[in-house]
Amino acid sequence: MQGVQEQIEELQTKLAFQELTVEELNQEVIKLNRLVAYQQHQIQLLVGKLQAMEPSNIATQAEETPPPHY
């Protein structure tokens, strides 16, 4: 059976590793939040460009006449 001091040291070691893991995960969350914000900005730019585009002269599928073999 371990002594009380050994148990305390083991718990302190586990706590130190958990604190390190929490900090590493926190840094990953921060990076992912920045990435999501960047991607949202890029999507907004693309939506703006799509909305600003002139309508195409190409007919839509609904406007096309069916091919002769129908």
UniProtKB/Swiss-Prot annotation:
It comes from the Bacteria. Pfam families: SlyX. Belongs to the SlyX family. This is Protein SlyX homolog. It comes from Shewanella sp. (strain W3-18-1).
